[in-house]
Amino acid sequence: VTAKTTRILITGAHGQLGQALLANLPWLPEFSPSRLRMKIPEVSLVPGSAVAPGSAIEIVALGHQQLDLTSADLSERLSEINADVIINCAAYNAVDAAEQDMAAAMALNAEAPERLAIWCRQRGAWLIHISSDYVFGNVFGNVFGNVFGNVFGKDLGNALGNVSGNAAANMLGNAPRALTESDVCEPLSLYGQSKLAGEQRLLKANPGALVLRTSWLYSRFGSNFVLTMRRLLTERPELKVVADQIGTPTWAEALARLIWQLLIWFHLKPEKSAVLSGCFHYAATGQCSWYLFTQEIAEQIAKQQCNSAPSSQAAVPLQTASPSQATLHSPANPAPITPGCRITPVSTAEYGALLNRAQAPRPAYSALDSSALKDAMAAMPSAFRCYLPKDYPSPIWLSWQAQLALMLSGLGAPSLD
């Protein structure tokens, strides 16, 4: 075992990805649940941290209350912690609120990453920064607006002008390609602008840093779309869900395991340097709308209910939307079953009207192509790869449906007991 010690700082540790990173520590070769404890004696000034005794990797996990990235003394705090790697999971994620509070969004999403980048460059530390698919605008908006206009008529075509992904693919017989790192970023919202500014300022200050763009994160932690839909499907007779925004749902624990693989690689390298730098995309494979995502959630939950329920109990079929809507938006697989909840597709504009409040604009199409990152990691020497138990499938490069199934079934949820 190498004698080199690598200290890893996780910022925003109370958030969804931060919790996923900590929950997946036991899957690392260097860790086991019985060896994990919640204090670093060498860094007693930092509470709420974890270390594997006897290993050469130390984890310092801090939430906003423990480490405010917008504070004037950030550099001094970072120097006290003295990390070799910083994983920046902290972010201002209130997309709609950012429209009214751009200063707060810029402070955490743009200025803080730049300050982290400068400190890491000066100290020779590696920075991994998490960004968002919302840095993109309507890359395919005009194209699909024309398609809908030709098929459904001008008025409906204009109304659905930003629809892309599965609906258009069903008509064209050819799904649009996912977005690559070289596609033009034109964020529509102030939140997206703040995230793009953070990427640009960070990489300008520290070209050796790594930016990971991801999309539609969900997990068993915090508040997210899957947990919300899982609850609402049992509470409401009808759910109206946006069908004209297309992206890729991504399991935060799959992203966490990818990051740990990169960190093991960094730790085992003989020289202290970044293993990857620049901007890369990570998401599950495939694409869907929020409406199709909700249908898949309902279907998978219903299957679980059927598998666990006595054979005498019949499942209640899901109520479908109107025929014209269902033809346009429904997946090819059978309608999901859930206790009597009707799932209806609506446009972004219709959903905004239902909320009766202003919404920040969202990209109509933001599915991410992860092939560049996959190729880069395929070149990783096999001895550096973080392994998983042989009977557990690695979730990193799975489809969004397969990742969702793992999350909902509870697989890949290691216990720290």
Language-model segment annotations:
Residues 6-27, 31:
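N-terminal Rossmann NAD(P)H-binding glycine-rich loop of SDR-like oxidoreductase domains
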Residues 20, 258, 265-315, 319-320, ...:
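Mid/C-terminal beta-alpha module of Rossmann-like enzyme folds, strongest
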Residues 69-108:
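NAD(P)H-binding glycine-rich loop region in Rossmannoid oxidoreductase-like domains
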Residues 79, 100-128:
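NAD(P)-cofactor binding segment of oxidoreductase domains
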Residues 95, 100, 133-153, 161-188:
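Active-site "gating" loop of Rossmann-like NAD(P)-dependent oxidoreductase/epimerase domains
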Residues 100, 107, 111-115, 170-212, ...:
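Catalytic helix-loop patch of NAD(P)-dependent Rossmann-fold dehydrogenases
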Residues 200-248, 253-261:
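NAD(P)-dependent short-chain dehydrogenase/reductase
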Residues 361-417:
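C-terminal amphipathic/interface module of NAD(P)-dependent oxidoreductases
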